[in-house]
């Protein structure tokens, strides 16, 4: 260039040098604004340096802050386009020059470990900042979070790598120890096999005579210990065997004694069932004991009559009473059969006697049920006698009666009105004197009704 360029063609902030012998440098500063008229007046600075050649760009590269140019010689005040000079300036990054940072900034610089880890200023200062500065702080905070996450990931990977290395190191050490132990054990085995005996560590300053004496003492001790240990167990074992045999024999005896009673009960039950079924299948042809059965029934006690009419006796019957119950049931069956046959013979002129098939089925059910209840009574008495060590008390063998010798007549009347439960037969017995006559009357009335029903049944069949 032979001449100086105009201010319209050159941007502000550029330095232009001319190749003339008297080298003059034109320095165009940034535009300044007057507070009154706000006219743009470029500032020009001349320098007589002979070394500078070419074009120099005095532009500071920074994403956060703009480089500050020195004020003009005229004393114009500098004001940026984004924010006022009174506002706070953010710190520059590593790319910016250190001379352009403001040392009096309230925001501290980034730490050495993390580049973007900057603490935020107070809320008042944040409110005083421009929106662009607030957005820059937001971006810095996000970058710091990302940086911290990256550091955490790096630390976790480093920790995992160190753990893997520790595990591999342990495996190597275990293998080496195993090899050493195997080698030492193999060497000791080879030495013992070559020598034929186990090598023992020799004592220092030992005398062979003393060693021989010690070995003989040890042998004698071992012999005494072995003899004592071998002699004691046989005595104990024999005692234990005798005790075990006694216990086993006792257990066997008690077991067989407990099993014998149920077996006997089962046999009795089988025989009773067989007898009942045979009796029900075989027809009754003997009619000789009709008068005897009637007399025995009239002379019977009220307890037997109530037990026979009840058709089911209590499970508390004893063995003796169960036998009498069986006999009474058999007599009743015979009596009913005789009554039915006598009524049929009166109606029929031919004198044909009906067989057992004409009997009522209720009588058969009554006989079977009475036999079953008697068997249940036997089972119960046998079980109770087997479980209890003592004999059955005498209070169950007789009928409970009211106390005698009451002086007061009212008490005597109350006792007569009460009923007593018989433990042997399982029937309720009233203490009233007129009970026997009433029971006999009811029984005769029932038998007469049954005879009439049988006669009507035969008539309907004949018709």
Curated annotation (Swiss-Prot):
- Tell me the superkingdom of the source: Eukaryota
GO CC, alphabetical: cytoplasm
Q: Where is the composition biased (Basic and acidic residues)?
A: 288-304
| Region Disordered, residue ranges | 1-110, 180-255, 281-358, 388-413
Family indicated by similarity: Belongs to the TDA11 family.
Q: Which UniProt keywords apply?
A: Coiled coil, Cytoplasm
Q: Where in the cell is it found?
A: Cytoplasm
Q: Which gene encodes it?
A: TDA11
Provide the primary localization: cytoplasm
Q: Carries keyword Thylakoid?
A: no
Indicate what this protein is called per its UniProt record. Topoisomerase I damage affected protein 11
